């Protein structure tokens, strides 16, 4: 059948056919949206279970910035609370730092619709940061420290037992490489930690969630997003480099980023070089074979028939 005949048939197709196609497309969209919601609930639930993030009787203070990730976190936690076998409370908290053009009406209006407890903390940290940081320099580090101290105080005042942040899997990966490349440390962003003041437990329930999923979920739910650049701070170029690197890896080498993320939970201290984590100095041969022990001279992990051709030969002396 020629293309012209197909085109004519399509043009003359009854309205019912177009309506049927539109209905099927709508069904597919609904299906995909539901699948995304189920995946987010499953991943957040798994993270909560794996790291014992939420316990019976907890009061979770969800830090809501107005960005896609914190909105998604609050939404999914509210869903899981209805299904959970334990009882826990949620209170949403936003810190209004008095940044220029901050739409202070958006979050209260949104939270009132949800009918959950919330608190808006008004603190002019913006003026402090602008006074102390030279023009053109990034203000994120100082702003973060000020914000952290305020949120710890608010958690105490509200009686919160856990502080929930909206960092996702991509944030964790980026932080890991930032610390490695620019800080010379093997250090990431843990899913659960004790705060630096020793008084609070901070949790990151989105630890297993990809940023692409929170972006799509925010579009589906039509969250009232508040821009994150109202302070006028310069973008963190180092983090941007890492983000671009990971995206390029994911594009060129599918599965690589997944493997790196999995490696964060399968660390072997005896095969690194930190004497604080493993007692190299006191290591002695016991004379007892270890069934799961490693051999001293490991074979090259990629020396298979399929990769022999990619091995670079050593230069021979003339």
Curated annotation (Swiss-Prot):
Keyword entries, A-Z? 4Fe-4S, ATP-binding, Cytoplasm, Iron, Iron-sulfur, Magnesium, Metal-binding, Nucleotide-binding, RNA-binding, Transferase, tRNA processing, tRNA-binding
The biological processes this protein is annotated with in GO are: tRNA thio-modification
Subcellular localization: Cytoplasm
- Keyword Cytoplasm on entry: yes
One Pfam family recorded for the sequence? ATP_bind_3
- Cofactor annotation comment: Binds 1 [4Fe-4S] cluster per subunit. The cluster is chelated by three Cys residues, the fourth Fe has a free coordination site that may bind a sulfur atom transferred from the persulfide of IscS.
Output one GO MF annotation: tRNA binding
| Reactions accelerated catalytically | cytidine(32) in tRNA + S-sulfanyl-L-cysteinyl-[cysteine desulfurase] + AH2 + ATP = 2-thiocytidine(32) in tRNA + L-cysteinyl-[cysteine desulfurase] + A + AMP + diphosphate + H(+)
Please give the cofactor(s) recorded in the UniProt entry for this protein.
Mg(2+); [4Fe-4S] cluster
Where the record places motif PP-loop motif is 65-70
User: What EC number(s) does this enzyme carry?
Assistant: 2.8.1.-
Q: Where is the signal peptide?
A: none
Q: Which residues cross the membrane?
A: none
The entry sums up its family as follows: Belongs to the TtcA family.
Give a short account of what the protein does: Catalyzes the ATP-dependent 2-thiolation of cytidine in position 32 of tRNA, to form 2-thiocytidine (s(2)C32). The sulfur atoms are provided by the cysteine/cysteine desulfurase (IscS) system.
- Which PANTHER family did the record assign? AMINOTRAN_5 DOMAIN-CONTAINING PROTEIN, SULFURTRANSFERASE-RELATED
Miscellaneous field: The thiolation reaction likely consists of two steps: a first activation step by ATP to form an adenylated intermediate of the target base of tRNA, and a second nucleophilic substitution step of the sulfur (S) atom supplied by the hydrosulfide attached to the Fe-S cluster.
Q: What is this protein called?
A: tRNA-cytidine(32) 2-sulfurtransferase
Q: What is the lineage of its organism?
A: Bacteria, Pseudomonadati, Pseudomonadota, Betaproteobacteria, Burkholderiales
